[in-house]
Amino acid sequence: LLESYKQAVRPLLPYLPWLEQSAGKRASSIYSGQDIGVNSVSFPVYDGTLLNFVREATKSPLMDRNYAYVYTRHRIRTHQEERDIIQKAGWKEWDILRGILSKYVLGGRTKGNLWSEAVSERIFYLVLKQMQEIIEFWDKTPANGKL
């Protein structure tokens, strides 16, 4: 089980430094060239690193399409509640971490501001960091659990 968790998280870890640096900042902007606001609906332009992260996360087994159930069952409503649960999460709460990550990755496909929100509110960073810490704590291999 631990090995499958490591394999799922490993492709996302290279994005940790970028997610940490981007915390509190917007990872998207609204395209407004060629007077687009006058004739049509404006649309967001995302940071390339964010798009690559979302693409990797979408392919990973960490995605839980039933993420809404995690939010309902644990009564998660605000970003602060998300951060509190993430910080307290351990091995047994792995599914909660998956649910929170999934809400933003999968939900961002239809609700344009979710990806940016997850970066600025540090949700992506905190979930990945906590997953990494859980794996490193429980992994007793000679490499000392380093991913």
Question: Whereabouts are the PLM-identified features?
Answer:
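Short terminal alpha-helical segments
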Residues: 1-68, 126
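Alpha-helix capping and inter-helical loop/turn segments
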Residues: 58-62, 91-92, 135-136
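Short, charge/polar-rich alpha-helical segments
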Residues: 78-95
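Short, Lys/Arg-enriched phosphate-binding patches
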Residues: 57, 67-73, 114-121
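Charged, low-complexity interaction regions
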Residues: 17-32, 36-40, 62, 87-91, ...
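Amphipathic alpha-helical binding modules
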Residues: 99-146
